[in-house]
Curated annotation (Swiss-Prot):
It comes from Neosartorya fischeri (strain ATCC 1020 / DSM 3700 / CBS 544.65 / FGSC A1164 / JCM 1740 / NRRL 181 / WB 181) (Aspergillus fischerianus). It comes from the Eukaryota. The gene is mpkc. The modification Phosphothreonine is found at T171. It catalyses: L-seryl-[protein] + ATP = O-phospho-L-seryl-[protein] + ADP + H(+); L-threonyl-[protein] + ATP = O-phospho-L-threonyl-[protein] + ADP + H(+). Activated by tyrosine and threonine phosphorylation. This is Mitogen-activated protein kinase mpkC. Its EC number is 2.7.11.24.
């Protein structure tokens, strides 16, 4: 039986096995506390996330179960990798994942990115999204702070707590406002994997211009900012809106023509703007997919169709429609943890194929210098 150490970190009881040493707080949110720590078995640093009160309600327990199942299933080098799961004596859930040095949000808050970093980062984001979407999963909360990066330019998407099955009817609580797709604001219940592509487009625009493209103060202001740049929603979009009040709101907007994105982003190549135009399309049915975006000429230096894997099959979402009491979810979570511990940690995703035409070494050196200058390492 594992031995536990108890500490108090940021006023929170933090229990961890003796496998880990030197926990240091790196993040705190409504769903948990995250600490860096050193794994004495793998001799690698990890991020230890304590999920706060996972069994307080059936909805929290279900969210925890969903996140654990997704982390166990999704295995790709541009997604955060699960290292360990354990349940503490106080019955809190702890998830250990690989630790990367910083996140994109932090980098963007310090100084603008060089265009070559923006190009490589959006390639990796889309590469990860292709895999996620092929598993029939929507991330739903893609934003710079959920994009982790290390000094070698390796990028990994994290935080699958809000991820969902792609299906016709969806709940409306998703995504930080700046990166929220218009179809979510217009209908709230009908959307697909295209919402992640919109979020990725907003992230690309922010990397290129050095500040958010649509920094809305509220839901209505957010939509005004979008239409101010992209013009009014086409009739095909309005026809799909299910709320009469929303239809009336959209029709009440002043007439606006799309602006030239190059005048909004400024000083960047037309090829980057062309990809952005295809990602930031109000109608999700005509928005480019992650897979097609990888083939865009802007990403030609990195694109390798033999090294952009899809999932082995769709994720099993059969549990997601269940409305179990929290005690049942608790048993299911315990079962998943025991299964993980008994089966063991699957092999990490393979690194980039060295036969790819892209040699990242020079870019890695430049990015390491960028991080050093920014005080991130």
């Amino acid at each position: 039986m594992a031995e536990f150490v108890r500490a108090e970190i940021l006023g929170t009881k933090f229990e961890y096995t003796t496998r880990y040493v030197n926990p240091q707080p790196i993040g705190m949110g409504s769903f948990g506390l995250v600490c860096s720590a050193f794994d004495q078995i793998t001799q690698q640093p990890v991020a230890l996330k304590k999920i706060m009160k996972p069994f307080d309600s059936s909805s929290l327990a279900k969210r925890t179960y969903r996140e654990i199942r997704l982390l166990k299933y999704l295995r790709h080098e541009n997604l955060i990798c699960l290292r360990d799961i354990f349940i503490s004596p106080l019955e809190d859930i702890y998830i250990a994942t690989e630790l990367l040095g910083t996140d994109l949000g932090r980098l963007l808050s310090i100084k603008p990115l060089d265009s070559k970093f923006s190009q490589y980062f959006i390639y990796q984001i889309l590469r990860g999204l292709k895999y996620i979407h092929s598993a029939n999963v929507i991330h739903r909360d893609l934003k710079p702070t959920n994009i982790l990066i290390n000094e070698n330019c390796d990028l990994k998407i994290c935080d699958f707590g809000l991820a969902r099955l792609q299906e016709p009817q969806m709940t409306g609580y998703v995504a930080t406002r700046y990166y929220r797709a218009p179809e979510i604001m217009l209908t709230w219940q009908r959307y697909g994997v295209q919402v992640d592509v919109w979020s990725a487009g907003c992230i690309l625009a922010e990397m290129l211009r050095g500040k958010p493209l649509f920094p809305g103060k509220d839901h209505v202001h957010q939509f005004h900012l979008i239409t101010n740049v992209l013009g009014n929603p086409p009739d095909a979009v309005i026809e799909k809106i299910t709320s009469k009040n929303t239809v009336n709101f959209v029709k009440s907007l002043p007439s606006r023509e799309p602006r030239d994105l190059s005048t909004v982003i400024m000083t960047h190549t037309s090829i980057a703007i062309d990809l952005l135009k295809k990602m930031l399309v109000i109608d999700p049915d005509t928005r480019i997919s992650a897979q097609d975006a990888l083939r865009h000429p802007y990403l030609a230096p990195y694109h390798d169709p033999t090294d952009e894997p899809a999932a082995s099959g769709p994720f099993d979402w059969s549990f997601d429609s269940a409305d179990f009491p929290k005690e049942t979810w608790k048993i299911m979570i315990y079962s998943e943890v025991l299964d993980y511990l008994n089966v063991g940690n699957p092999a990490d995703p393979a690194p980039f194929d060295p036969s790819t035409p892209f040699d990242p070494s020079a870019l890695e050196r430049e990015f390491s210098e960028f991080l050093s200058d920014s005080g991130q390492i």
